[in-house]
Each structure stands twice: as structure tokens, then as C-alpha cells.
Amino acid sequence: FAAISGIVVAGTAFAPHWLLQLPVFFALALLFIAVRRLSGIHLYGVGACFMLAWLLPTTYWYYYFMSPGVAFGASVGWALLQANLFWIIALRRYIRTYGAVVLFVIAWCTLTYIRTHAPVVEDWWIPHLGYSVWRNDSITMWSAYGGEAVLEAIVLLCGVSIAWLIVHARMSVWIRMSCGLVVLVAIANSIV
């Protein structure tokens, strides 16, 4: 599921219409469901698989101004570095699943905030999760309150919410709630 989720997230970054970007939420939900029972090195492996499937296709333009080896190394290096965030999910043994998921989202968004504001790395061209919703005005308007980190928090929390519904609610409930989320985003997008 990790590779499929990564490919879907990468694909939504290139979607020509905001409606085609909605699968990002379900792709992340599948990712969160896949990691909920894993521990240790398996979490890192799934995280690395997801990050590589997402970042390698979205850094295609590195090859235009870097040598192939440097471009590939930069993409793989960042993917493997960011996959370390998945170790946080192993903390669920100590702080329960909800605490680990919240800490994961906070850590991801903090890393993004630092990456986009720190003096040396602010100009690094690394794809953001927010690219997967960049055509959706009802979501991107929230970037005024914290930039890319806020967009990533919204995308991650929507994925977590859908994963929770799939795991904990009856089938009819999660289908209705997931469809409701999609309809809510669609309505909000048409208003903005």
C-alpha cells in the first residue's frame, strides 16, 4: 500500500483539476492504515517506500539542472531522510495511537516549516505534500495562516480522519463520512 499511496500522492500533484486531487486524502488514509500495526524497522521501510514512490516522480525536473547522479542522489537522500518521521509511529506503545499520530503530523509540519523558513534551506526545491492540493482553492487559502506547513497539516489530518473512519466505523458510516468530506471540499471549493 505504501508504494501505491506514494504514486497516488505524486499523481495528484500533476492533476489538471482540483477534483482529481481528492484521491490524495484516501491514499494517505491507506498509508496510515498500513502502518498502524507495524513496528520498528518495518515502519521505516514503509515510510521509505512511500517517500520514494512520491518524491522520485515529483523531482523529475532536478535532471534539467543537475547531473543524473546528483539529481537521483538528492531525491533518494531526501526521501530516506524524511522516512525517518515514520519512527514516531512506534511511540504508540507509550503514548497511544492518537498521541503518536498527532506527534507524527506535528513533526512532519515542523520539518516543512523549518525547511521553508530556515536561512540555508528555504530555497531548496523539494516537493511538498501541499502540491497535491494546489489547485484546490478551498484548501490553499489556509496557507495564509502558516504557509506550506498548514497545507500539509490539513492534508495529513484529512488522511488520518479517513483512516480512523475506515478502521473504527461500520462500513456504511465510513463510506458516508468519506463521501461527505469529499462533498464538503467540493462545496467549499465552488464557494471560494
Name each model feature, range by range.
Residues 1-192:
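Membrane-embedded alpha-helical bundles of multi-pass enzymes
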